[in-house]
Amino acid sequence: MSLKLSLVSLSNTDLPIETKQQALIDIVLRFLTPQERASLFESITHQRETNLLARYPEYQSKSLSVLFELMDYRDLVRLDPNNLHDDVYLLELTVAECFPHWLDFWCACEIEAIKQKYSLENREPATELSFEDASYSAMLIDDISKSSMRVQLPSYPVAMTLSDAVALSNLELFVQGEKWYEILPLLSLSQKGKHFILLQTQTTPVLVASALIQDWNQRNTWLSYAPQFNSEKWRFCLPLHGYQELNRLDILASDLVTDYGSLTVFDQAFQTHITKTEMVCEVLRLTVSGSVQHKLYFLYLAQKELMNVLFQSGYKVGFTIIEQAFMLNFYQSIDSKAYFHSGYCDINGDGINTYRGFWNFESMVDTFKRTDFRDYKRRIRVIRQNTQVNEHA
């Protein structure tokens, strides 16, 4: 049966929505190669983004999650038929009947494509995740696509490649959970390159946290320097002690001055001044897995181990982008030299600021030497009594 006939057959059935969703995913995975899927998903996404911005130009700078929820996707598909062949139009019509929108379907397909490589018939014995720091080990992997390590996830207890495990955890947390659809066309960054990983050590280690580490020579793919995070919409807020720390760390040819009028101008100056580029990186996609309580613990432990691993590897400063309230609240409670903001922006106009900032790895290591999980939670509880993040921290 062809793709078109399979879609017609599915459209004519009266199945429960969850069954129909799974059947549609299976059809796409069966008839399209990974390369064909990638091309199709990106083409339709680009066309629908263009259609939506033509209707709502005031949403030009909003995230894809906001943009794709502006109107009923079924109406969008009918009002603006895609300009590809009939099979694709029928596919999109069927997607619109089964999923909230195209990006939700894309994410579901990527998750299922990974899971179908590994049968749950080969599931690992049930694992109880510990709250003891000594049960975990942390390391930096130069290129996870070349690693022979096999790990499992709390959400999917089957031995799989490290690159698939990292990609699956990123999809489940950031895309499926937090609707960060911008990751989808850049999913390959979760499948290769340098990553920090945190494992519960056992016969088949359990991957409980990971983060993408990009060196200075990869800054063309840094999110910090992408247009959405490096525009005039961003409020520049680097504090005086931030300048002092960056100048003190011996990574610059000459001191930064304190009169940069915008984040964009500061970024340009930093790139001009930096000489010891091997000591600077960007850290993104800090992912944790498990139950709600375990995620909070792994967020604590992952930060603690991440700072130590990167500092021991010769890094002094890390660029990062944070919206996570627990992390921001904790940073307000510690030495202001350990983490400081460089800019912030309410990207979606929903009252939630996203922050760009710097980790000073040596100071962060010192902070976590004095902070156990109980103290971490206590600090967060105290800071949560305040209603705002201090953008000058």
UniProtKB/Swiss-Prot annotation:
Pfam families: AHL_synthase. One of its GO terms (biological process) is quorum sensing. It catalyses: a fatty acyl-[ACP] + S-adenosyl-L-methionine = an N-acyl-L-homoserine lactone + S-methyl-5'-thioadenosine + holo-[ACP] + H(+). GO terms for molecular function: N-acyl homoserine lactone synthase activity. It comes from the Bacteria. Its EC number is 2.3.1.184. InterPro entries: AHL_synthase. Keywords: Autoinducer synthesis, Quorum sensing, S-adenosyl-L-methionine, Transferase. Belongs to the LuxM / VanM family. This is Acyl-homoserine-lactone synthase OpaM. It comes from Vibrio parahaemolyticus serotype O3:K6 (strain RIMD 2210633).
